[in-house]
């Protein structure tokens, strides 16, 4: 039986804000966000662009990564992205 992979991802919204999320299909989830059918937050800040994603074998670990990102200050989110060599500016 194949194991399922879960992802934590970070989007850059049109207003320059970051959005952290969780999914089992990054490509489909980003398309859903850009169709305005994702989170209310991103629907009001279209379009969004995928900046980063990280795979996890365990759902809890992916959800934990999302929770920790969402509870950081803007500065700490920027540091996280820079530490992962993500160009977003």
UniProtKB/Swiss-Prot annotation:
Residues 4-79 form the GIY-YIG domain. InterPro entries: GIY-YIG_endonuc, GIY-YIG_endonuc_sf, UPF0213_domain. It comes from the Bacteria. Pfam families: GIY-YIG. PANTHER family: UPF0213 PROTEIN YHBQ (PTHR34477:SF1). Belongs to the UPF0213 family. This is UPF0213 protein LSEI_1587. It comes from Lacticaseibacillus paracasei (strain ATCC 334 / BCRC 17002 / CCUG 31169 / CIP 107868 / KCTC 3260 / NRRL B-441).
């Amino acid at each position: 039986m194949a194991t399922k992979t879960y992802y934590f991802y970070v989007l850059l919204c049109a207003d320059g804000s970051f959005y952290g999320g969780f999914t089992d299909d990054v490509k489909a989830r980003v398309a859903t966000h850009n169709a305005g059918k994702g989170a209310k937050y991103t629907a009001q800040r279209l379009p969004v662009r995928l900046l980063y994603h990280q795979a996890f074998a365990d759902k809890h670990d992916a959800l934990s990564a999302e929770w920790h990102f969402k509870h950081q200050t803007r500065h700490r989110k920027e540091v996280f992205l820079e530490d992962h060599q993500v160009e977003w500016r």
